[in-house]
Each structure stands twice: as structure tokens, then as C-alpha cells.
Amino acid sequence: NNHGRGLLCIGHPGRGKTIICTKIIPSIIIDSCNLITNIYDATDLNNLIDKILKNRIVCIDDIGTEGEYVKYGEHRVPFAELVDLAEKKGTLLILTTNLTVDELRVKYGERVVDRLRAITNVIYFKGCSLRK
């Protein structure tokens, strides 16, 4: 039981985070709950943030790779917006990143990391790369 919390999967490249979060977990959710999830790459955040924020379950791969976003002269941090609204609306987040918690804090700030800890279970992927 996840107690309504999503997942924040952290680890070096090649540890299996993307496969688990974009292939296996969505298959389980769709099969067992009849819910459809949309899977996005972090670079999609800039162009699709408004659409993404409307979903009940959101899977974002490779958090920390997205660039700065300016819309109508306004600087936005789509990932921070996503985390903020996910907390307010109860959106389930499934996230992967190669960044450490400290690197996430530097990139997005303490507020975002604190909210992430509140709404996700952090799972660390350790070991050697599974890629050949």
C-alpha cells in the first residue's frame, strides 16, 4: 500500500528506473485499476506542462534534464509547478532522476524537495549499470 504516495526513483544511469517506472508500473496500474497513465520525458514539461497538470497519475522520466521555460515573457519552473499542484490535487507522481536529493535541492529548492518527500516514497537504485 503506497498510502496515496507516488514514487521518486533515484540512481545512476542504467539501473532500471526508466523500465520500471515507464513500462512495468503503468502496466500494473492499467491492468489492476483500469486507469490510463500518460508517460512523459522531463523535456516534455516545458511544452506540455498545462496538459500534464490535468492528469490524475503522471509519470515523468529523467527529472532534472528539462531546461528553463519562458511563456509570454514569464519564467516558469514546470517541475516545481507540477509538484506543487500534485500536492494540492492529490496527483500521483511517478518520477525518475539521475540526480541526488542534494542536486534536486540545488536545482529546484528546498520547498520542492520537501513537497516531494511528502508526496512520494523515495527509492534508491544502487549497483552497477544493467546496460551492456
Where are these predicted regions, by residue range?
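The conserved Walker
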Residues: 13
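Phosphate-binding P-loop
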Residues: 1-4
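Hydrophobic positions on the alpha1 helix immediately C-terminal to the Walker A/P-loop
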Residues: 20, 24
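Conserved lysine of the Walker
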Residues: 17
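Hydrophobic anchor at the beta1->P-loop junction of P-loop NTPases
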Residues: 9
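AAA+/P-loop NTPase substrate/partner-engagement loops
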Residues: 26-66
